[in-house]
């Protein structure tokens, strides 16, 4: 009897979710100055994220020389950011739901500012590592809350574009480090990493809270005020507000979120997709290549100064392609294109180092390696760099978004920490073998994306829940 009641309840929820489809509201299609400003303020944290990711590439020689660090000590320093981010990820979801999206970003900014200043004024490895962990914890918080916040405030027809600006600003931070790391001291670079955090601290006073979070905590009046600011003062926000409230109440009544809830059959599919994309993003080598681009170029015999400068110049235009295409092509085609490019270029980098080891074409392999590294980073930037976070922010319903988002973010940063720490040692083992492994992961990733990743282009968050309600049937039930 109880089982029949549960089935009937889920069927009722499904029917009500499906009623939300095919509803449209012109006010939801408006792009207002408030949405643009709110997105810009949110992605200021993403710029600091990018600076942190590329910092070890631009500052490696200076830090190791000034503080007399060994390779093992510097590898530990590089990986501590991702270790700290994994710690931050554990609390990111809970903080985002208890404090709200804006206050969570404030906490992140405080931790990042402390971290960057500790690095900038470090006199020994202890303060250097403390700063790296502190800023890492802040990045762990912001890596979850920024894409979620942007997805929750954006009109559905441009949600992918706006959420992908998270990746664009990450690439801007990377570009700044790659370019300016050639002539700025590593301490100055650290201070530049803190600058966008100060901008965000001030800017958050002028942007609204997420309407979906306000609905979850029962602040109906604030929900309407937030939507009016986001959609325009003359917009009719009644239908969108109603859909958000109905969806929130349905998922709240359906079940209260707990860790065990994630493994229910109806959530298993989205959890597999979210975690799978994060594992693909990291074990295809992205963190390693971005963090140690200068090391790779140096091993290939290419000028680090020229290579870093050119990578910095190309970084932002590459990410712009993803911003333009994400709501035109859709998530799946862009992911498949991105991962295909990363797979091919990883294999080609492996071939280049194989030729170098065999002492064949010595005058061509440095340039060939640089071209392949540039294409690898470019194909990463247009898809796999940002889309896992875009999709993560879309596919989880409100009642499990906190727990699921925290787990997915934790997986991302934990795997990134492993790859970042191990990369230098992998290069000592076999440079070409390392990139062949990355290429093989890319090949498996193509199969995963083709079979499992859903298309969410053009759907509201409520419509995505309706479309995914039957997706557990795609996963083999045990």
Curated annotation (Swiss-Prot):
CDD domains, per the entry: MFS_GLUT6_8_Class3_like
Compartments, as annotated in UniProt: Membrane
This protein's record includes keyword Ubl conjugation: no
Cleavable signal peptide: none
Spans traversing the lipid bilayer: 31-51, 71-91, 110-130, 133-153, 162-180, 188-208, 270-290, 306-326, 333-353, 367-387, 407-427, 433-453
GO molecular function, a single term: sugar transmembrane transporter activity
PROSITE patterns the UniProt entry points to: MFS (PS50850), SUGAR_TRANSPORT_1 (PS00216)
Tissue: Expressed in leaf vasculature, stem and flowers.
Major location category of this protein: membrane
Protein name: Sugar transporter ERD6-like 18
Organism: Arabidopsis thaliana (Mouse-ear cress)
């Amino acid at each position: 009897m109880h089982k029949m009641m549960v089935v009937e309840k889920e069927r009722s929820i499904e029917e009500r979710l499906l009623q939300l489809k095919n509803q449209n509201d012109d006010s939801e299609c408006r792009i207002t100055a408030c949405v643009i400003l709110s997105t810009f303020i949110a992605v200021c944290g993403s710029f600091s994220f990018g600076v942190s990711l590329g910092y070890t590439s631009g500052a490696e020689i200076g830090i190791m020389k000034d503080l007399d660090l060994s390779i093992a000590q510097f590898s530990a320093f590089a990986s501590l950011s991702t270790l700290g981010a994994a710690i931050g990820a554990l609390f990111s979801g809970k903080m985002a739901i208890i404090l709200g999206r804006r206050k969570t970003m404030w906490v992140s900014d405080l931790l990042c500012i402390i971290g960057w200043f500790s690095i900038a004024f470090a006199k020994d490895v202890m303060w250097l590592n403390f700063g790296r962990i502190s800023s890492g914890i802040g990045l762990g918080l912001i890596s979850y809350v920024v894409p979620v916040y942007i997805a929750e405030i954006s009109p559905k027809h441009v949600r992918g574009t706006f959420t992908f600006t998270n990746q664009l600003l990450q690439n801007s931070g990377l570009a700044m480090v790659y370019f300016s790391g050639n002539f700025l001291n590593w301490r100055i670079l650290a201070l530049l990493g803190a600058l966008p955090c100060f901008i965000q601290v001030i800017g958050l006073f002028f942007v609204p809270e997420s309407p979906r979070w306000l609905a979850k905590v029962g602040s109906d009046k604030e929900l309407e005020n937030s939507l009016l600011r986001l959609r325009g003062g003359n917009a009719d926000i009644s239908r969108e507000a109603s859909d958000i409230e109905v969806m929130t109440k349905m998922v709240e009544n359906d079940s209260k979120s707990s860790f065990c809830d994630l493994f229910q059959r109806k959530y298993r599919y989205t959890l597999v997709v979210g975690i799978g994309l994060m594992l693909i993003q990291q074990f295809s080598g992205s963190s390693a290549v971005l963090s140690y681009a200068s090391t790779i170029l140096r091993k290939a015999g290419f000028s680090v100064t020229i290579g870093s400068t050119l990578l910095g110049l190309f970084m932002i235009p590459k990410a712009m392609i993803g911003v333009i295409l994400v709501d035109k092509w859709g998530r799946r085609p862009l992911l498949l294109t991105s991962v295909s490019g990363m797979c091919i270029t990883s294999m080609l980098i492996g071939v280049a180092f194989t030729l170098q080891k065999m002492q064949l074409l010595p005058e061509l392999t440095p340039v060939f390696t640089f071209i392949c590294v540039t294409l690898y980073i470019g194909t990463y930037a247009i898809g796999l760099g940002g889309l896992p976070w875009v999709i993560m922010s879309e596919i989880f319903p409100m009642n499990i978004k906190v727990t699921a988002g925290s787990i997915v973010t934790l997986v991302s940063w934990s795997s990134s920490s492993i790859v970042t720490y191990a990369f230098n040692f992998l290069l000592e083992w076999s440079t070409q073998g390392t990139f062949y492994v990355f290429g093989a992961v890319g090949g498996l990733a193509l199969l995963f994306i083709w079979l499992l990743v859903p298309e969410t282009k053009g759907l509201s968050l409520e419509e995505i829940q309706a479309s995914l309600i039957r997706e557990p049937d795609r996963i083999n039930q045990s």
